[in-house]
Amino acid sequence: MEKYVAAMVLSAAGDALGYYNGKWEFLQDGEKIHRQLAQLGGLDALDVGRWRVSDDTVMHLATAEALVEAGKAPKLTQLYYLLAKHYQDCMEDMDGRAPGGASVHNAMQLKPGKPNGWRIPFNSHEGGCGAAMRAMCIGLRFPHHSQLDTLIQVSIESGRMTHHHPTGYLGALASALFTAYAVNSRPPLQWGKGLMELLPEAKKYIVQSGYFVEENLQHWSYFQTKWENYLKLRGILDGESAPTFPESFGVKERDQFYTSLSYSGWGGSSGHDAPMIAYDAVLAAGDSWKELAHRAFFHGGDSDSTAAIAGCWWGVMYGFKGVSPSNYEKLEYRNRLEETARALYSLGSKEDTVISL
């Protein structure tokens, strides 16, 4: 239970820290951010009392609360209706939270009350990280091996409610899958290989769902290729070897590396690289919250999204170990996050099945 609470709370704490009321999400210079961090007294001194959460946490809560509202053994039609409704409703809470364009525009296009009203058409420009940043809790709700198919379907469909492009919604799959792996204490060095093994299943689901199949398959390879290249670079494509990092991999080098992973020059702003940067930080940080933060929260890329994802996975693995209470005690929406986490724990600890479409 504590790990579930830490997952939801530290995801939001990471988001608030990486966002810094918009100052750090859009400051594309990691060295400047780290200098400002030092001037504020370093990570342990940061009190998030006045640091708002961004769109990432508002939408992650929307996903989580929809999952809780759907209850035990839900019908997928009902779950998708609830997800669409919560995504639409949460748009009223975006003032000062810098929501992504695709998330806002497409959430408002959803018609939750109509049959299939949660579906939007394919769009070749929807590879952003908006689907990935809000999907982690799907892995808290469906963590069991027997629920893998459900995790694939729900993460993809929740993702393509606003990001109907494989680079976008496969990011949601990665976020949810790695959370489930963390719940099951699977060592992080195996996670990447697990994702690669699951991509054919995801593709099969896209074909079976029969919705914009051709367009999705045409744009499929980018996500897969990017991840394969990254796993090869770290030497963990086999899921057995320890990851290798460059000897010199400080703030500046990490900024350059994150930019090199990106689609458009802003590291972590897409569906493939937001979870990738979060994963890179988890691999390097081990049980150190500070090391995780320095790598995933404070950099020149889309820092609140990589932080929200990394904070969730790390929280599942390590709880609140070594985290300064000031980083989360006065966190916005903390009660909601904790309440939702406890409800997800009671649903996720039982191996229920969903009623398919």
From Swiss-Prot:
As cofactor, the record names: Mg(2+)
Q: Tell me which residues bind Mg(2+) 1.
A: 54-56, 304
InterPro entries named among the record's database cross-references? ADP-ribosylarg_hydro, ADP-ribosylglycohydrolase, Ribosyl_crysJ1, Ribosyl_crysJ1_sf
Judged by the first EC level, this protein's enzyme class is hydrolase
Residues noted as binding substrate in the record, renumbered to the chain: 85, 101-103, 124, 130, 163-165, 263-265, 269-270
From its record, what is one biological process in GO terms? Answer: protein de-ADP-ribosylation
| Cofactor note as given | Binds 2 magnesium ions per subunit.
Question: What positions does the entry give for Mg(2+) 2 binding?
Answer: 302, 304-305
Outcome of mutating residue 56 to N, per the record?
Answer: Complete loss of activity
Which EC numbers does the record give?
Answer: 3.2.2.19
| Cellular component GO terms, alphabetical | extracellular space
Altering residue 302 to N: what's the impact?
Answer: Complete loss of activity
What catalytic activity does the UniProt entry give for this protein?
N(omega)-(ADP-D-ribosyl)-L-arginyl-[protein] + H2O = ADP-D-ribose + L-arginyl-[protein]; alpha-NAD(+) + H2O = ADP-D-ribose + nicotinamide + H(+)
Lineage top rank: taxon: Eukaryota
Resulting phenotype, residue 55 to N: Complete loss of activity
Q: Which GO terms describe its molecular function?
A: ADP-ribosylarginine hydrolase activity; magnesium ion binding; potassium ion binding
Going by the UniProt record, its keywords in alphabetical order are: Hydrolase, Magnesium, Metal-binding
Q: Which family does it belong to?
A: Belongs to the ADP-ribosylglycohydrolase family.
Q: What function does this protein fulfil?
A: Specifically acts as an arginine mono-ADP-ribosylhydrolase by mediating the removal of mono-ADP-ribose attached to arginine residues on proteins.
Q: What is this protein called?
A: ADP-ribosylhydrolase ARH1
Record gene name: ADPRH
